[in-house]
């Protein structure tokens, strides 16, 4: 049993006791029955009114709860609709009081969410408005009267974040462009003269509208200023170039040049003005020194002609070059020609540089070719001979590659310009072919000269004898082996040798001219055959080394037809007798023969012990 039911029974018991107590009191007092009835009726009435009042109050409470439930349910549905959430559903059976409480709690929660969303929406709208005003962009389209959903709020947040990033990037770009604009204005000595320029340079950076239009206008302004700066720099550089040319033409002293060194850098307006004043001064000075200037221009013209590989006909086509009436019109013609040549060279600079590279490579190749044919290259070479050969081989490979590359580029140029590219009045490949042909002819001519020289030298040796220089070191005597030793009859020289040539005085082996040997039958001697174009092995060795061309002494050997045939070697006795005759002649004995005397003295001692050496007899 519920406690409320127990309390109700207790209330009934209390009421019964109270009525019984009233009856007892009435009996003791002696109240008649009719009055008891009235009094009981009053008690009943009071009790009933009290209970009715209590019941009415509880019924009122019930009605209020039911009404509250209805109101909360209605408001909750509205909030769920505004907040875009599912409607509230009560789980299971519940009392009116609990239902009202649950609905009221849910309504309060929904109201709180609605308030938070409205506050966040308001904050985002304020940020969006501020950013859009700075960026000059339209506001975010959202209904501020309705409650935004979570998705709508998330999108709004992302939009505001994007606006912040856009603002940061545009601000960075604005600051960078502004800095460059200020530098350009300072370089140009330019002061802001429009409202936009003043807003950019003078106003606060945070107050500047970072719209796309303003950024584009900023970029345009920067391009204009940079173009003005570039033009100003180009003008100043042109004025400086003009000043240097005028200095060189007028031969201005270095002291005077250093006086204006401060304006030879920079491109500000005051620098440009000072440069123009200097040019005007030099131009006036140029007019006063017309002849000197024109001659300087002519020197420069020749340099450009050389760089452009002009032929003699092309150079002669400029008739004013030889004129001697030094007037202003002549100077203008020369200036115009210089400008034309400069432009022509700059347009075709790559081709001219390629041809110049080929020319330099060709000259270097010819130099190595000359060194390769020089007999002196074998003396005092210091290890350079191999390097030169490698470089010459490298150049031989490089030249055809350069020629092919230039040929392709020149053909492309000729197709574009519909005219021939000339080098010294010829097409480039014709010029190259001519250079190779001239080189081949020069080599052929040199070869023929060497052959003719060798032929003449051989004929001279046949008539007068040869005297190759012996090495500084004496070769050791070969062992006298039975297989190689030849027994030679050695005789002393007869008096007939007095008819022969003068004996050698500077040392070395004596080679007499070959003569025909008399036949055993005593018939006439056979005439010696003349030397053909081929070199003998001795002659080849003689021409291959410079040392063989430089004689330590002079040899005049006897070569008349009646002399006996001479062999290649002399006996020690023959050499010794020759030296004894040489020593008797006071006109030939001098300090230069001291070394020879020592050598012959050693040879005489060696002859006494070594027996017969490889030698030849000189017969009368």
UniProtKB/Swiss-Prot annotation:
> Does the entry feature the keyword Nucleus, yes or no?
yes
Q: Does the keyword Cytoplasm apply?
A: yes
* Chief site of localization: nucleus
Residue ranges of region Required for the interaction with KIF4A?
1-303
Q: Which residues cross the membrane?
A: none
Pfam families (UniProt xref): MAP65_ASE1
What tissue expression does the UniProt record report for this protein?
Answer: Overexpressed in bladder cancer cells.
Q: What is known about its subunit structure? A: Homodimer. Interacts with the C-terminal Rho-GAP domain and the basic region of RACGAP1. The interaction with RACGAP1 inhibits its GAP activity towards CDC42 in vitro, which may be required for maintaining normal spindle morphology. Interacts (via N-terminus) with the C-terminus of CENPE (via C-terminus); the interaction occurs during late mitosis. Interacts (via N-terminus) with KIF4A (via C-terminus); the interaction is required for the progression of mitosis. Interacts (via N-terminus) with KIF23 (via C-terminus); the interaction occurs during late mitosis. Interacts with KIF14 and KIF20A.
Q: What is this protein called?
A: Protein regulator of cytokinesis 1
Species source reads Homo sapiens (Human)
């Amino acid at each position: 049993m519920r406690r409320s039911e127990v309390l109700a029974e207790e209330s009934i018991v209390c009421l019964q006791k109270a009525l019984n107590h009233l009856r007892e009191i009435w009996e003791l007092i002696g109240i008649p029955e009719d009055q008891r009835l009235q009094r009981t009726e009053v008690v009943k009435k009071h009790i009933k009114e009290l209970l009715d009042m209590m019941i009415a109050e509880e019924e009122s409470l019930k009605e209020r709860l039911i009404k509250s439930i209805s109101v909360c349910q209605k408001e909750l549905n509205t909030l769920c609709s505004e907040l875009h959430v599912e409607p509230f559903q009560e789980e299971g059976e519940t009392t009116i009081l609990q239902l009202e409480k649950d609905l009221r709690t849910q309504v309060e929660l929904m109201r709180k969410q609605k308030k938070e969303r409205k506050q966040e929406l308001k904050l985002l709208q304020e940020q969006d408005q501020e950013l859009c005003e700075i960026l000059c962009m339209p506001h975010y389209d959202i209904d501020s009267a309705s409650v935004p959903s979570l998705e709508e709020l998330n999108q709004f947040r992302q939009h505001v974040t994007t606006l912040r990033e856009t603002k940061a990037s545009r601000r960075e770009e604005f600051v960078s462009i502004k800095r460059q604009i200020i530098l350009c204005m300072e370089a140009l000595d330019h002061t802001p003269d429009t409202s936009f320029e003043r807003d950019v340079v003078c106003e606060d950076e945070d107050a500047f509208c970072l719209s796309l239009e303003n950024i584009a206008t900023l970029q345009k302004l920067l391009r204009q200023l940079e173009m003005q700066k570039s033009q100003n720099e180009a003008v100043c550089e042109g004025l400086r170039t003009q000043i240097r040319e005028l200095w060189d033409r007028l031969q201005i002293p270095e002291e005077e040049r250093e006086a204006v060194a401060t304006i030879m850098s920079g491109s500000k307006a005051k620098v440009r003005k000072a440069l123009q004043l200097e040019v005007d001064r030099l131009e006036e000075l140029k007019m006063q020194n017309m002849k000197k200037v024109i001659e300087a221009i002519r020197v420069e013209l020749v340099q450009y002609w050389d760089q452009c590989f002009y032929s003699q006909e092309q150079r002669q086509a400029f008739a004013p070059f030889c004129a001697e009436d030094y007037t202003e019109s002549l100077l203008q013609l020369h200036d115009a020609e210089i400008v034309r040549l400069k432009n022509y060279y700059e347009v075709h600079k790559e081709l001219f540089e390629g041809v110049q590279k080929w020319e330099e490579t060709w000259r270097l190749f010819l130099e190595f070719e000359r060194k390769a044919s020089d007999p002196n290259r074998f003396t005092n070479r210091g290890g350079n001979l191999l390097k030169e050969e490698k470089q010459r081989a490298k150049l031989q490979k490089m030249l055809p590659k350069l020629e092919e590359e230039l040929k392709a580029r020149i053909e492309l140029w000729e197709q574009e310009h519909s005219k021939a590219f000339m080098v010294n009045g010829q097409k480039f490949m014709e010029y190259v072919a001519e250079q190779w042909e001239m080189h081949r002819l020069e080599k052929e001519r040199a070869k023929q000269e060497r052959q003719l020289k060798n032929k003449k030298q051989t004929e001279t040796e046949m008539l007068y004898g040869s005297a190759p220089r012996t090495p500084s070191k004496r070769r050791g005597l070969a062992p006298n082996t039975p297989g190689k030793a030849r027994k030679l009859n050695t005789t002393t020289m007869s008096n007939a040798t007095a008819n022969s040539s003068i004996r050698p005085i500077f040392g070395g082996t004596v080679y007499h001219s070959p003569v025909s040997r008399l036949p055993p039958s005593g018939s006439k001697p056979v005439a010696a055959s003349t030397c053909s174009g081929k070199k003998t092995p001795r002659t080849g060795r003689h021409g291959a080394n410079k040392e063989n061309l430089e004689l330590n002494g002079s040899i005049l050997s006897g070569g008349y037809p009646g002399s006996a045939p001479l062999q290649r070697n002399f006996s020690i006795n023959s050499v010794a007798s020759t030296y004894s005759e040489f020593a008797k002649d006071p006109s030939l004995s001098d300090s230069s023969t001291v070394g020879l005397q020592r050598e012959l003295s050693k040879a005489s001692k060696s002859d006494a012990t070594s027996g017969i050496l490889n030698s030849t007899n000189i017969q009368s």
